[in-house]
């Protein structure tokens, strides 16, 4: 490695902040040239949150314009085409307060549909803004635009946004979303002095479409039917690949990202896992980390040397920068959790944590060593909430009796599509998700229809009140991170094997202030019981957050208060996204332009031929 260039914390000039005036929200053409024109901007310094941001309980409107396009970038030293927002890689940081309204005008300059999901935000009363094509909206077409408009209600903490169209998230469409509140249990100035984001992703040298297409064949991707672990690990948009393995003469070794922190301070590190596959274990040489947040919930947690973060999860930890003097540097290490992924190989991503003060910033690389007690290959693959007790600082006990309990049996197996072809894929309750991308389930329920069909596993919570979601991970050797949209859940029980309605009453559940999350790692051959409050009408996705598994059908939905959905009024711009499309087409289908210009010519038969029956219904029935 080379000496590190001096990095300065610059403001993000690529986010377009505009006045809160009414705009035309109908989808319109913005571009018909989909080839990359620019080199993406990679600036890790934008992940240092400024203490000048005003934390207040006075609501305001924060308005952005996001231009999604292609660009060239070499985030790990290997140049490839990437997807960018406002030419930034990763995309812009959104920072707001509880009660603020966030408006994001999205212009899609790609040659495929797109959507944005606001991971962890409940979308209370704004189910139409959740951003899942085929579930809560039609995709934003190539050359089209759409405006997301929602209020952040009763939430604060660490979140993120990302594409929910196929697995194009893995090509670069993601960024942090931080919500502050003067009433949150963790207060800047009292509990910590400085605030930094650590945005972690796996990174592939091939576009996601290439990988998805290969995984749908018997040969798999590069001879392996299992999804890849990544060619590199990126931290705040930068990493280092093995240039020898790439065979590229232009590959180079960029300096690792640098996280500058004042000496003798308490620094909050917000770890966001935007990975498409691996669980990562994170440590900082010489610095114990006090866990203080899990998925937006402030917690009392342990002080540890290493934190495990699964895809979609977020954890905050506080470190004390009193292990040296101004200019000293320490390695932040991010390693693949080898016991959590079949066939994984050792891989480490590095960042520099450097102490700053009033003098010049040193460029010397760290000479520090890793903790001697870091997890090895044989360490069980458990989530942080399994390994330690994480107690929410705002105490909330779970109701003793649920109104309803629904089972979701999750497994890989043989499925058959409508053409009669068999393939190996993923599903819930014997159904592998088949996405009618231009006929959103939310719209179907709004019109009085039902999601109970052979295209998606669906369960309904008709009334307001507590309910159980029981996930049985029947894949004995495959672990999965499960993410639930529109809801925060309490983890009231875990165990090995599988639960059924017969033995559910025999479990001693944790009801006294259990941890609250929205993404949960469940080991193969294990179960978890999630307690929700069915208070947010909508059709909400429940899916594996390994992006490659999601594209192979690992998605189900819960329908909350369908009668209330029938009285919800959808925005006109939302309805216009589905104009001139084929509701029987299966996604991710493409349109050549905005629906105001040209109607979709994609038929379900054409699409099924294209993907060779990748998403199908499973043979047989095996309901809980």
From Swiss-Prot:
**Cofactor binding summary note:** Binds 4 Cu cations per monomer.
Q: What do mutants without this gene show?
A: Decreases virulence in mice.
Q: Where is this region: Disordered?
A: 579-604
InterPro entries attached here? Answer: Cu-oxidase-like_N, Cu-oxidase_2nd, Cu-oxidase_C, Cu-oxidase_fam, Cupredoxin
Alphabetized Gene3D superfamilies for the sequence: Cupredoxins - blue copper proteins (2.60.40.420)
Positions contributing to Cu cation 4 binding: 480, 544, 549
Described purpose of this protein according to its UniProt entry: Laccase that catalyzes the oxidation of certain aromatic compounds, including L-dopa, to quinones, which then polymerize to melanin. Able to oxidize a wide variety of aromatic diphenol and diamino groups in the ortho, meta, and para positions but not monophenolic groups such as in phenol, tyramine, or tyrosine. Plays an important role in virulence. Plays a role in dissemination to extrapulmonary sites but is not involved in pulmonary growth or in elicitation of cellular immune responses in the lung.
What name appears for this protein in its UniProt entry?
A: Laccase-1
Taxonomic source organism: Cryptococcus neoformans var. neoformans serotype D (strain B-3501A)
Taxonomic lineage from the root: Eukaryota, Fungi, Dikarya, Basidiomycota, Agaricomycotina
């Amino acid at each position: 490695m080379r000496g590190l260039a001096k990095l300065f914390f610059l403001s993000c000039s690529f986010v377009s902040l505009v006045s809160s005036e009414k705009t035309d929200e109908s989808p319109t053409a913005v571009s018909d040239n989909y080839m990359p024109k620019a080199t993406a901007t990679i600036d890790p310094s934008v992940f240092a949150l400024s203490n000048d941001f005003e934390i207040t309980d006075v609501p305001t409107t924060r308005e952005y314009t996001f231009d999604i396009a292609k660009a060239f970038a070499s985030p790990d030293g290997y140049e490839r085409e990437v997807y960018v927002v406002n030419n930034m890689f990763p995309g812009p940081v959104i920072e707001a307060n509880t009660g603020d309204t966030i408006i994001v005008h999205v212009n899609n300059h790609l040659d495929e549909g797109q959507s944005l999901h606001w991971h962890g935000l409940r979308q209370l009363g704004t189910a139409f803004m959740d951003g899942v094509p085929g579930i809560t909206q039609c995709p934003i077409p190539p050359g089209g635009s759409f405006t997301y408009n929602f209020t952040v209600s009763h939430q604060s903490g660490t979140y993120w946004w990302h594409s929910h169209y196929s697995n194009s998230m893995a090509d670069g469409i993601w960024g942090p979303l931080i919500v502050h509140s003067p009433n949150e249990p963790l207060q800047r100035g009292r509990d910590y002095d400085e605030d930094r984001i650590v945005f972690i992703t796996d990174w592939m040298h091939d576009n996601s479409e290439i990988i998805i297409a290969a995984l749908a064949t018997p040969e798999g991707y590069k001879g392996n039917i299992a999804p890849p672990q990544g060619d590199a690990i990126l931290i705040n948009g930068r990493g280092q690949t093995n240039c020898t393995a790439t065979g590229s003469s232009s590959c180079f070794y960029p300096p690792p990202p640098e996280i500058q922190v004042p000496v003798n301070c308490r620094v909050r590190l917000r770890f966001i896992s935007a990975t498409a596959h691996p669980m990562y274990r994170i440590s900082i040489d010489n610095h114990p980390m006090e866990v203080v947040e899990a998925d937006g919930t402030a917690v009392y947690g342990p002080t540890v040397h290493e934190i495990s973060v699964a895809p979609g999860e977020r954890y905050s930890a506080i470190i004390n920068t009193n292990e040296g003097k101004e200019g000293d540097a320490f390695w932040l290490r991010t390693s693949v959790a080898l016991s959590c992924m079949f066939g994984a190989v050792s891989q480490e991503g590095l960042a520099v944590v450097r102490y700053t003060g009033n003098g010049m910033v040193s460029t010397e690389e760290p000479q520090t060593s890793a903790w001697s007690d870091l997890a090895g290959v044989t360490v069980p693959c458990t989530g942080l909430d399994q390994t330690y007790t994480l107690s929410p600082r705002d105490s909330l006990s779970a109701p003793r009796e649920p109104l309803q309990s629904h089972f979701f049996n999750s497994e890989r197996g043989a499925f058959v599509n409508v053409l009669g072809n068999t393939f190996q894929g993923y599903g819930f309750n014997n159904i592998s998700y088949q996405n009618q991308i231009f006929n959103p389930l939310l719209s179907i329920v709004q019109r009085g229809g039902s999601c109970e069909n052979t295209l998606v596993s669906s369960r309904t919570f008709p009334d307001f009140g507590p309910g159980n979601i029981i996930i049985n991970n029947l894949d004995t050797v495959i672990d999965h991170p499960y993410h639930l949209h529109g809801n925060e859940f309490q983890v009231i029980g875990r165990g090995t094997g599988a639960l059924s309605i017969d033995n559910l009453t025999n479990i001693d559940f944790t009801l006294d202030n259990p941890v609250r999350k929205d993404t949960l790692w469940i080991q193969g051959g294990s179960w978890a019981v999630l307690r929700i409050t069915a208070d947010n009408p909508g059709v909400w996705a429940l899916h594996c957050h390994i992006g490659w598994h999601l594209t192979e059908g690992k998605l189900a939905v819960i329908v909350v208060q369908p009668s209330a959905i029938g009285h919800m009024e959808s925005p006109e711009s939302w309805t216009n996204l589905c104009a001139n499309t084929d509701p029987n087409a299966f996604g991710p289908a493409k349109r050549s332009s905005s629906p105001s210009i040209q109607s979709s010519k994609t038929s379900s038969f054409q699409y099924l031929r294209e993907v060779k029956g990748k998403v199908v219904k499973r043979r047989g029935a095996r309901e809980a």
